[in-house]
């Protein structure tokens, strides 16, 4: 099976919905106290805005003409921050691969393309957030070489 990693086009907005549903279900199952049961999709307007914004990156993974994965990311510019030096960070919002296509290297290809893009944009690092219940994602990102930098804590009232 040949995997093609490419930049998204407008038609992909509808084609990624099954993947967004998988992510929404995963988050709801892991934290039903925080996440709604219904998936929230990008509107076509929001998707179009991200496609046109040079700071945003939307990558698509295709296998045999089917969208089987995607990555959403954008550049965060830290300037004149109270504690950080000035730098650009490539923030990965989502990397998602259909359940039926996991463990085939597709996520790794998306991650590697994110790295290439981050380097081209002269970013210092890549950053992301992952919920502690999402053990598969944590293992995947660690396998890709990411390390834990901070830990966000919560106290439920």
Question: Which residues does each PLM region occupy?
Answer:
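Conserved GNAT-fold acetyl-CoA-binding loop/helix
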Residues: 24-47
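Conserved GNAT acetyl-CoA-binding A-motif
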Residues: 118-129
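Conserved beta-strand-loop-alpha-helix junction that forms the acyl-donor binding cleft
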Residues: 127-137, 154-157
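Conserved active-site tyrosine of GNAT-family acetyltransferases
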Residues: 65, 141, 146
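Conserved beta-strand in the GNAT
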Residues: 60, 66-75, 91, 96
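Conserved acetyl-CoA-binding loop-helix of GNAT-fold acetyltransferases
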Residues: 97, 103-116, 143
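A short helix-loop-beta-strand connector motif used in the catalytic cores of GNAT acetyltransferases and
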Residues: 45-59, 91
């Amino acid at each position: 099976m040949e995997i093609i990693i490419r930049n998204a086009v407008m038609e992909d907005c509808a084609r990624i919905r099954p993947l967004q549903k998988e992510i929404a279900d995963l988050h709801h199952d892991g934290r039903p106290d925080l996440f709604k049961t219904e998936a929230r999709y990008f509107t076509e307007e929001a998707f179009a805005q991200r496609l046109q914004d040079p700071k945003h990156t939307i990558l698509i993974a295709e296998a045999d003409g089917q969208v089987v994965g995607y990555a959403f990311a954008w550049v965060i510019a830290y300037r004149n921050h109270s504690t950080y030096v000035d730098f650009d960070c490539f923030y990965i919002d989502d990397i998602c691969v259909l359940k039926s296509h996991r463990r085939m290297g597709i996520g790794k290809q998306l991650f590697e393309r994110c790295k290439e893009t981050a380097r081209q944009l002269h970013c210092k690092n890549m950053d992301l957030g992952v919920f502690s219940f999402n053990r598969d994602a944590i293992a995947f990102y660690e396998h890709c070489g990411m390390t834990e930098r901070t830990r966000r804590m919560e106290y439920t009232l």
